[in-house]
Structures are given as structure tokens and as C-alpha cells.
Amino acid sequence: MVHFIFVTGGVVSSLGKGLTAASLAMLLQAKGFRVSVRKLDPYLNIDPGTMNPHEHGEVYVTDDGAETDLDLGHYERFTGVSACKFDSITTGAIYSKLLKDERLGNYAGVTVQVIPHVTNIIKDFILSNTKGFDFIICEIGGTVGDIEGLPFFEAIRQIGNKLKSENCLFIHLTLLPYVKTARELKIKPTQHSVKALRAIGISPNILVCRAERNISKGEIDKISLLCNIESEYVVPAIDQKNIYLVPIAYHNSGLDNKVLKFFNINIMPSKLDKWHDIINRLKDSNSKVRIAIIAKYHKLKDAYKSVIEALDHAGIYYKYKIDLVWINAENLTEENINKKLLDIDGILVPGGFGERATKGTIIAIKYARTNNIPFFGICFGMQLATIEIAQNLIGIKDAVTEEFKVDGTKIIEKINKNCEDSKITIENVKKTMRLGSYPCSLVASTIAANAYKSLEINERHRHRYKFNNEFQNIFEKHGIVFSGFSKDEEIVEIIELPLLRWFVGVQFHPEFKSKPFEAHPLFIQFIKAAIEYNKCN
């Protein structure tokens, strides 16, 4: 029988419910259990695919092409298990299905209501696709008390009532704010959060308390008394310097064993060798390398969450700290770039959409190429790299991307040529996007082939434009190597400038497949080049 664990949050948002769910999944996995982690988001968007990165953060793409919340990236990175479209749902997707079914007459003329019809869809999502798993961990987005989340809390209340405690566990994550003037952690917000949860019929079984300093036994006992939870099941979650220290911190707090004890499951030893190795590597990371991220969504670093993590994974691999330097691409000019990129060891241009900030980004790419600084362009970053090369190396001064709808020589063109600009609307925007994992063939003896140690790979994509193959010959005459292609050879996947120290652009998103214990080969090689550049300068 599968066991369900629901992770909810209170007091404030962004407490780390996703990291808690991912950490618990990893810890249970380390004991030999099969675990699936899912995210239920209360917002009305069908998925985050069309949301502004400044509003939502990164859109995490799964192998099967689902555009999901960045928390699924945490789930994958911690467990090593690929997420899929069945691991994420939103209120928007629920209402979309509900209204479609209502129009088709599937409700047989009854009055369609939040209870039971919306809650039934939520329950079906949670209770479906459970075969082969010992635990299903469901993270409920937002905080208790949010009006958008009420149907989700009602649905999991009903599930808990049906399955009873033998197969259902509620974990509630709260904040214990530290008031410096009083020199104490405040428990009152946690009391109110638990009270709000109980008011809708859910009594938390485990209370995870986030705090910036250690929680004393006296404070734990007080929380236990006031929240009516045994002190054994009040788990401290103290701030950590690095997110990869969180799972072991939870293990040291006994979270995994408490879950097993609650379910009356025999406690087995944990195999955590690879995580202890990560911790040791982090402790041994005394040297650092400076990487500039040329960002158009610089106001919210979570817009590049997987890129940041993938760089850290490569840093862990080499026992180096990655010192990220965030550069607002809109503010870059020929006049200030020397100052902005002073003492930089590597330049990375991540994915993005739209014309804004492209001028400054192209200036940064030119700076990397002409100064022989290690460069890594991802998706849009690769596309802009080809435009920079066309304009400044080959001499095609009017080189443009078709995405911006301007006159010029289209170095970057639509994947689907039959899709006119006027047809690209919110309604069919998904149909124009190449989403998910696709195979890619590599050319032997190239940077890419040497990095992957294979000629056949699979990587995840999220784009609707590609390199115009009509210009391949002229690019090759100027020293550019096309080292990766889609299986039908229609889409250029990787470009390289082998005469430079390390200059690589990829059409896909390698950051989505990087793990802390298995850094992505391209990020490994990029950081290696940056380390060597640092030593030479």
C-alpha cells in the first residue's frame, strides 16, 4: 500500500517546502524506498509556460515536455528521478478540464461546484499513477489561509479522512522569526498557522520549524504544548549555507525516521555516502572562480535556478566555489563592458525570449569571443552567439533573428515555417514550441563529443526558433564547428569555436539534467576552462 505525505506551509511563503519535500524524498530513497514527489500549485495559470520569469521564476521542463514549477527541479536533482507531466498540476489546469467536461455534458446536468467536482479532480490527480511507489509526497503551493489554496486543502483533508493515519501523513512547515531585541524565537505565528490548518480540518502530524538559529529543547517543548504535537515530531529546520546541506540536516534531525515511525515501518539504515561526499567537497572548496551571468531577468535570480545549480554542481566536482556575478544585460555598452566584466573567468548567457536586452547581450558575447574568455551560450544564448558571429566576424551586418520581426538577414528562423507571426497567440503558443527531450547526434572529435564521451545524447528543449542552415557553409569557412544536430539534421544543436579557449553554444537546456552528484558534462568542461583561465590570469 502506498503511503501519502502532504507538505504544507504557513506564516510566509518561500520557506522551503520544495526543498523539504525533495530532501525527505531523497532520505526515504536512501533507505531503499521508491518515492514520487508532486507539486500542486493554486494559481489560475494552466502552467507557468507563459508566465513572466520575473513573476514566477524558472520554467522547469521535463523529459515529456511539461512546463512546470522550479520545485520539480529540486525533486529531480535530489532524487535523480526524472519528473513528468503527472507530477504537476495547477488550479488553471483543473478548471480547464472541469469546464471542458461540463461543456461535453460529462457531469450529466448536475450543478458543478468546487466541492465535490474541483476537489475530486485534485484527489484523482493525487491518487493516480501510484503504481510502483512506496511513498507519494505532495507539496501544496502557497500558504495555509490563501483563498486560492482552499480546494487543495479540502481535497487532502478528504484523502486523510479516507486513508486514516496508517497511510496518510501531514507535514506543516512554519517560520519561527527571531526578534533580535528580545533575543528569542517567536512561536506565536506558528501557533496561528497550525490553528488555521486545524480550522479547515487538518491536524499536522509533523511540524517542521524554520529558524535562523538553533531551537532549544525548551522552545520545542513549548511548541509541542501550544500546537498539540508531540515534541518528538517537532523538527527543527535551521538555515544552511548551501541547499545541499539540507538533506543531511534533516537526517540528523531524524525527519526520515520519524516518518517511518509514524507509519509503523521498520527503520532501515540509510545509504548517504554520495551526499556525505558532496558535503566534504563543499567543505574542501577553498578556491573560487568568477562566472558572469548575462541576465535579462536579473531582478529575480530564481529565473535561472537550474543554471545556478548546474554551475554549483560543476564547482562541487572540482571543489571550487562559484562566485556568480550578475550582469544586467540592458545596461551593458561598449563603453562600460571592460569595467563590468573585470576579473571574470567565464561568461554564460542563459535562455530567454524577446528583444529586450539583446543588444547588451551581443556586446558581452563579442567581448568573450574577442578576449578569449570561456563562453557558454544556452538556447537563446546560442542564437545570439550566432548573430554576434555573423555581424562581427563574418561581416553580415544586418544579421537578425526572425523572433524580433525586423528586416534583415535571418540567421535565426522559425522551426515551423508554416506558422505565421499573426498566428502565434496565447491560444496556440504551445504548438509552436519544441518542448521536452529530443535525441541529438554529435560530431566525433569535437568539444561536445569529448565532453559527453558519446556521439548520441538526449537533452531537453524549450524553443521555437533555430539556426538557419543556409548559413552553415559560410560559418564553417570562418572556423565555426557545428558539432551537434537533431536526428533529422534539420536543427543545429551545438556550435563551437575550437580555436578559442572554450566557446560553446547549445540550443537545448543542459542545466535541467545536472545533478549535485552527477554534474552535467558541458558545465564541467565550462568550469574547467574558467579555472584554467583564472590560473593563467
Swiss-Prot record:
Where is UTP annotated to bind?
Answer: 13, 222
Which pathway does the UniProt entry assign to this protein? Pyrimidine metabolism; CTP biosynthesis via de novo pathway; CTP from UDP: step 2/2
Under catalytic activity, the entry for this protein gives: UTP + L-glutamine + ATP + H2O = CTP + L-glutamate + ADP + phosphate + 2 H(+); L-glutamine + H2O = L-glutamate + NH4(+); UTP + NH4(+) + ATP = CTP + ADP + phosphate + 2 H(+)
User: Which segments carry the region annotation Amidoligase domain?
Assistant: 1-265
| Annotated positions binding CTP | 13, 146-148, 222
Q: Which domain of life is it from?
A: Bacteria
PROSITE patterns tied to this protein: GATASE_TYPE_1
InterPro entries named among the record's database cross-references: Class_I_gatase-like (IPR029062), CTP_synthase (IPR004468), CTP_synthase_N (IPR017456), GATASE (IPR017926), GATase1_CTP_Synthase (IPR033828), P-loop_NTPase (IPR027417)
Where along the chain is ATP bound? 14-19, 71
Alphabetically ordered keywords of this record: ATP-binding, Glutamine amidotransferase, Ligase, Magnesium, Metal-binding, Nucleotide-binding, Pyrimidine biosynthesis
What EC designation does it have?
A: 6.3.4.2
- GO terms for CC? cytoophidium; cytoplasm
Name the positions where Mg(2+) binds.
Answer: 71, 139
Q: What does the record give as the active site? A: 379, 509, 511
Q: Where is the Glutamine amidotransferase type-1 domain?
A: 290-536
**Biological role:** Catalyzes the ATP-dependent amination of UTP to CTP with either L-glutamine or ammonia as the source of nitrogen. Regulates intracellular CTP levels through interactions with the four ribonucleotide triphosphates.
Instruction: Return the NCBIfam families for the record.
Output: PRK05380.1, PyrG
Q: Which family does it belong to?
A: Belongs to the CTP synthase family.
Q: What else is known?
A: CTPSs have evolved a hybrid strategy for distinguishing between UTP and CTP. The overlapping regions of the product feedback inhibitory and substrate sites recognize a common feature in both compounds, the triphosphate moiety. To differentiate isosteric substrate and product pyrimidine rings, an additional pocket far from the expected kinase/ligase catalytic site, specifically recognizes the cytosine and ribose portions of the product inhibitor.
Name the record gives this protein = CTP synthase
Per the UniProt record, the source organism is: Rickettsia conorii (strain ATCC VR-613 / Malish 7)
